[in-house]
Design a protein with these regions (language model features):
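Long, ordered, helix-rich scaffold segments
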Residues: 376, 393, 400-756
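Beta-propeller domains with acidic blade repeats across secreted/periplasmic ectodomains
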Residues: 2-421, 431-442
Length: 756
């Protein structure tokens, strides 16, 4: 199949409205901007239509992914009769408006993103990540696309589809994934165990080592990320919060569903201290219009695109701030990112720009070679899901500048000598810096030059927080590229860092590094980090520390008990107790030792042990009582903390006569309770198979948090209405629940007939 064909289907509009978008020049005239800023039309229909993603190449040309196959929520999401394409827009004379348009490839379907580098073009067309080689750079593909990865969910996925290719400062190609479905991503020949599993969050791919991995799990449907001058990545999101700091191994809050790790007891909240909508409203109310309170807060919860401006065109007071396109509010929100404890906090700044065009649907924004910001406008009337059809024949790229920037001299980084490229790494022009870094990575790969062995020396520019963080990140990246754990000598250096470095960000990355260490090597570093009580209230550090040690707990329970005793991080103490108590039937002696620590005088947070035990056994009907429970109960019943007294009462029941079935049923059906406690309550109830419980289970079929247990329980009850009710809810289930639904429907001939 040719890269560009004469048979490209003519895009047609399904938009129900008879209105038309505001003329592009009028959009620029009516936009409300800060003093001194100008908005200009870089390109507009028919030269660009439905721009879903934009990027620049090493020559400063704008590449645009045009998506025509998207059909909206009421048309099956995608139209198989159409195709998508990648075009190149070039401003040869530097006047701020494109004067050359080239169609590079028009064979795409479900195209969501484009990125250029390493001798070709990367395009994301779920279920595949494709690479289109163009080594001679003649803008004609050298051959058919190569499938680098497959397994991206796309069958039932609409607006939450995988998206967002962007080069990271580490040479990896990053992408995003929405919440509607779970993907198993890997090279075409990879087995299931060799694939990266992701449901919602951030993933990345290494173009040389051909390795893919999940970076961060959580959020809702991220459609934008960028990184600051130090390489710290941030991503944008919708509904539940809008800005997260991306740290490898993090697990964040999510709109719905359950994290893959059942022992991720707490999920990380956003780093912004505010939201852009009135949370007293339901999230979907904005579809009917923006209330005055949501307008004042920022325009709505739906965001697309993220730019941390680091160019040299905008005045200094606008630099190093985060800018995102607010979908419903038709504006650019602005947040100020500041260091806070072990990470960052984002503070609300006045909205940067407002667009009067009712059709304005900003979807991406990036800085260009001259420091101007390019904004991709989908140009349509629908909101996030396009219930009213798609207007495929409109689309714009605007350019936002301070004044009229001096036309940049045309550049071609591929033609530059190596030393000149290296000089650009210190440039104040971030576009040049990033493009030079990518070009250097490509040349290193072409020359097959290994990274110098002393790259990770700890004598880095006289130390300093950002330098140490950079060293940790680089070493983690190298280990990930080679699919190995961190070397022991480096782990020893990490322990020294934890002892001697006062910086919170260093500690945060040390906690992240735990997940890449051999399990047996994690304890010494964890002990040092557990002493950093000044970061116990940080929104990320305690959780990252727990996630780093969690998988080692049951392998070395005696070390876990010792860590609980010396920990000055309350959440860590609680989670250690919680995880150990879950093993009470298999390993009751360890729980007794844990209580000895709580009863003793050397534990900094003994009440957290009781709370952790209570969380662990919430939903249990009965558990064996530790030998020293009466002594512990006597001590903590006298606590001044109400929640500790309540925990003692609950544990005494579980360790005594057991919890009543009615109490378990109330917990199981309480949608506001902890998901794992509800699941455990269902398991305990179903073990006794209470009479008439099928009706209760039917009422829970739409509850994703307990779907597996509910479906498994329905197999115990013969009820003729069960098949119909299961099949009606099947579309909302993740893969494990769908598999359980099939198992249940296969338990009886009449159920199986309904399935068939």
């Amino acid at each position: 199949m040719p890269a560009v064909g004469d048979d490209f289907p003519t895009p047609h509009n399904t938009e129900k409205s008879a209105d038309s978008p505001m003329p592009p020049d009028e959009v620029c005239r009516t936009a409300k901007l800060p003093p001194g800023f100008e908005l200009a039309v870089f390109a507009a229909e028919p030269d660009v239509q439905n721009p879903i993603a934009i990027t620049f190449d090493e020559r400063g040309r704008l590449w645009v992914a045009e998506n025509f196959t998207y059909a909206g929520a009421n048309a099956g999401w995608f139209d198989a009769n159409l195709r998508d394409r990648v075009i190149i827009l070039e401003d040869a004379d530097g006047d701020g408006r494109h004067d050359k348009r080239t169609v590079f490839w028009d064979q795409g379907r479900k195209l969501t993103s484009v990125e250029v580098g390493f001798g070709g073009v990367f395009v994301l067309c779920p279920p595949q990540l494709l690479f289109i080689p163009d080594t001679n750079r003649d803008d004609i593909p050298d051959g058919p696309p190569q499938v680098l990865l497959n397994g991206f969910a796309e069958g039932v996925v609409g607006h939450n589809i995988a998206n967002g290719l962007k080069w990271g400062p580490d040479g990896w190609l990053y992408g995003r994934h929405g919440i509607q479905e779970t993907s198993l991503i890997g090279p075409p020949a990879a087995t299931e165990s060799q694939r990266a599993k992701i449901n919602t969050g951030i993933w990345r791919y290494h173009p040389v080592h051909r390795k893919v991995e999940a970076v961060m799990h959580g959020m809702t449907n991220s459609w934008g990320f960028d990184y600051d001058q130090h390489g710290e990545m941030f991503c944008i999101n919708t509904v539940i919060g809008h800005l997260w700091h991306v740290v490898p191994g993090a697990r964040t809050e999510r709109m719905y569903g359950i994290d893959f790790n059942p022992h991720a007891y707490q999920l990380i909240k956003q780093c912004a201290d505010h939201v852009h909508w009135d949370t007293g409203e339901l999230w979907h109310q904005v579809q009917k219009g923006i209330s005055s309170t949501t307008d004042a807060a920022g325009g709505g919860h739906a965001h697309s695109g993220l730019l941390i401006y680091q160019g040299d065109n905008w005045p200094k007071e606008y630099r190093h701030k985060a800018y995102t396109l607010n979908m419903h509010g038709r504006r650019i929100n602005c947040d100020r990112i500041e260091p806070y404890l072990a990470g960052f906090v984002a503070k609300h700044e006045p909205d940067f720009a407002h667009f009067a065009d009712p059709w304005f649907r900003g979807i991406d924004l990036i800085a260009g070679p001259d420091g101007g910001v390019y904004i991709a406008d989908w140009s349509d009337t629908g909101e996030c899901h396009d219930h009213d059809g798609v207007h495929r024949t409109s689309g714009r790229i605007y350019k936002l500048t301070y004044g009229k920037p001096t036309p940049t001299q045309r550049v071609d980084l591929r033609a530059m000598p190596l030393l000149d490229l290296a000089d650009l790494l210190a440039s104040g022009n971030t576009w040049l810096k990033r493009a030079a870094s990518l070009e250097l990575s490509y040349r290193m790969q072409e020359a097959k030059s290994p990274l110098p062995s002393d790259l990770l020396s700890f004598e880095v520019a006289n130390g300093g927080e950002q330098n140490l963080v950079h060293v940790i990140r680089m070493t983690m990246n190298l280990a990930a590229q080679e699919s190995r754990s961190l070397p022991q000598e480096f782990c020893d250096e990490l322990v020294q860092m934890a002892q001697n470095d006062p910086a919170g960000l260093t500690c945060l990355y040390l906690a992240a590094a735990l997940q890449q260490m051999e399990v047996d090597h994690r304890w010494t570093l964890a002990e040092q980090l557990a002493a950093r009580k000044e970061f116990s209230d940080d929104r990320m550090f305690p959780i990252m520390l727990w996630l780093g040690i969690e998988s080692a707990v049951t392998q070395s329970p005696h070390k876990a008990v010792a860590l609980a005793q010396l920990s000055h991080i309350p959440l860590l103490t609680q989670n250690l107790a919680r995880r150990l108590t879950l093993e009470i039937e298999r390993d009751p002696k360890t729980v007794t030792k844990l209580l000895d620590v709580a009863i003793g005088t050397e534990c900094a947070h003994p009440h957290e042990i009781i709370l952790g035990m209570s969380h662990a056994l919430n939903g249990w009907r009965k558990a064996p009582a530790p030998a020293n429970w009466s002594q512990a109960a006597q001590k903590f019943s006298a606590s001044d903390l109400t929640e500790v007294k309540q925990a003692v009462q609950q544990l005494s029941i579980v360790f005594g006569d057991g919890v009543a079935l009615d109490t378990l049923s109330q917990l199981a059906t309480n949608g506001g309770a902890q998901p794992e406690a509800r699941r455990q309550a269902l398991r305990a109830l179903l073990a006794s198979k209470p009479t008439g419980f099928a009706a209760t289970l039917h009422g829970l079929l739409g509850d994703r948090a307990v779907a597996v247990e509910v479906l498994r329980g329905l197999a115990l009850y013969d009820d003729p209405s069960t098949p119909e009710k299961i099949l009606a809810a099947l579309g909302i289930y993740p893969p494990d629940a769908r598999a359980e639904a099939v198992n249940t429907l296969a338990t009886r001939p009449e159920y199986a007939r309904a399935l068939l």
